[in-house]
C-alpha cells in the first residue's frame, strides 16, 4: 500500500505522471536552455554559457513558453520517451535524477515551495549566462559548470520508490 504522505515523484513512475505533475518537476534552473555542442570525434557534450534567445537570464524562465516551438523550432519538448534517449541534461536536472533513481534535491521548488533554492544552491543559470542574441560564436563561451553538480548543493540520495 502506498503511503498517503509520500510525494508524487516518489510514487508515480515518470511515464504515468499527469502533465501537471510532469511540468512541476522542472526546477526552473535554465541549464537545459543553454546551447550545447557535440564533439564530432568523441560525441562528448560540450556545454556553453549561451542561453536560448527566449530565456530570461535572470529569472531563468522562458519568455514565451507557450509559443516557443514556433520561435525556436529546435526547442526540445521533454517527454518520458525522449528522456530515455538524451544524454545532455545536466546532472542536477530533476527529470534525469528521477530517471536514474535519485530523489529531488533539497532546494527543488516542490520541496521548498519557492524558486529561491534553485538559485541560492548554484543550480540555476541566473546571471551566469549570456543570450545568444549577444554572444557571438559558441566556441568563445565554453564552460564546464553547466554539466557539473551545483557547488553549493549536497548530492541527492538514491530514491527507493514507495508502493
Swiss-Prot record:
<dbReference type="Pfam" id="PF03692">
    <property type="entry name" value="CxxCxxCC"/>
</dbReference>
<protein>
    <recommendedName>
        <fullName>UPF0260 protein GOX1406</fullName>
    </recommendedName>
</protein>
<comment type="similarity">
    <text>Belongs to the UPF0260 family.</text>
</comment>
<dbReference type="InterPro" id="IPR005358">
    <property type="entry name" value="Puta_zinc/iron-chelating_dom"/>
</dbReference>
<dbReference type="InterPro" id="IPR008228">
    <property type="entry name" value="UCP006173"/>
</dbReference>
Amino acid at each position: 500500500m502506498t503511503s498517503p504522505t509520500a510525494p508524487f515523484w516518489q510514487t508515480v513512475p515518470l511515464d504515468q505522471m499527469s502533465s501537471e505533475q510532469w511540468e512541476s518537476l522542472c526546477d526552473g534552473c535554465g541549464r537545459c536552455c543553454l546551447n550545447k555542442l557535440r564533439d564530432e570525434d568523441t560525441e562528448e557534450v560540450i556545454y556553453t554559457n549561451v542561453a536560448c534567445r527566449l530565456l530570461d537570464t535572470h529569472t531563468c524562465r522562458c519568455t514565451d513558453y507557450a509559443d516557443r516551438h514556433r520561435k525556436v523550432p529546435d526547442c526540445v519538448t521533454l517527454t518520458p520517451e525522449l528522456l530515455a534517449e538524451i544524454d545532455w541534461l545536466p546532472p542536477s536536472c530533476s527529470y534525469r535524477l528521477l530517471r536514474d533513481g535519485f530523489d529531488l534535491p533539497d532546494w527543488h521548488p516542490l520541496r521548498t515551495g519557492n524558486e529561491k533554492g534553485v538559485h541560492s544552491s548554484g543550480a540555476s543559470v541566473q546571471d551566469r549566462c549570456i543570450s545568444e542574441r549577444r554572444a557571438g560564436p559558441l566556441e568563445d563561451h565554453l564552460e564546464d559548470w553547466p554539466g557539473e553538480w551545483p557547488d553549493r548543493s549536497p548530492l541527492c540520495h538514491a530514491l527507493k520508490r514507495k508502493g
